[in-house]
Amino acid sequence: AFKEKNIPLSQKVYSLPGADFSDISNKYDTIIVGSDQVWRPKYTGGIEKYFLSFADNRIKKIAYSASFGTDKNEYSFYEKWVCGKLIKRFDAISVREESAISLIREQLHWDVDVIQTLDPTMLLDITDYKSLVGQVVNNNKIFVYILDSSVQKISFVEKLEKVLCMPGFTITPKGMDNKSA
C-alpha cells in the first residue's frame, strides 16, 4: 500500500529473476541504474544485468547513486571480470558511499571515472517525511528490516520484543520471517 500511494511508477518493463531483457534496447535511448545494494552480487542474482549487460552500445548508460552496500569485494573472479568490462561502457557513474569509490579503484581495479553523490533519500524535503509520519498506524508491533542477518541481530530483536512486550515482524532480503502472523 505504501509503495502504490507514495512512489509513482512507470509501466513495468521486466521482473527479476530470469527476465528477458532483449527488447529493452529497442525501447529506450538512456537507461539509469541505481539503488541501495544494486551492485552487491550477494543480493541481486545475475549481477551483470545491473551493469546493463543487455543494453547495446547506442544506449546511454548512467549509474546514479549506485551502492555496493559494503566496503568489501564480494565479486567472484568471473563477476569482477565481466562487470569490469561492462562498467567501462557507462557514460556517467556516481555512487552513494565514499567507500564504493575505493572498492571500485583499489579492490576491483576498475579504471573508470566515478564520483560520490548524495543518497537519493536525502533529496526529499523534511515536509515530505513529515507527511509520511502522519500516516503511521500503531498496531503494537515492531517492524524490523535486517539486511545482513546474524545471530547477534536476531538475539537483539528477540530481547527488544520481550522488553517492549510486542511481537516483531522481521523482513530480510532472503525472505520473510513473520513471527506475529
Model-predicted segments: where are they?
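Alpha-helix capping/helix-boundary segments
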Residues: 38, 99-100
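Aromatic- and Gly/Pro-rich donor/ligand-binding loops
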Residues: 1-85, 155
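Acidic anion/phosphate-binding donor-loop and adjacent secondary structure
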Residues: 72-77, 122-135
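Nucleotide-sugar donor-binding and catalytic loop/hinge architecture
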Residues: 24-27, 55-58, 128-141
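Catalytic donor nucleotide-activated moiety binding site of glycosyltransferases and closely related
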Residues: 63-70, 101-104, 146, 153-181
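A short beta-strand/loop micro-motif in the catalytic core of glycosyltransferases
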Residues: 90-97
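Donor nucleotide-activated moiety binding/catalytic core segment of transferases
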Residues: 114-121, 126, 176-181
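Helix-loop-beta element that forms the nucleotide-linked donor phosphate-binding surface
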Residues: 101-121
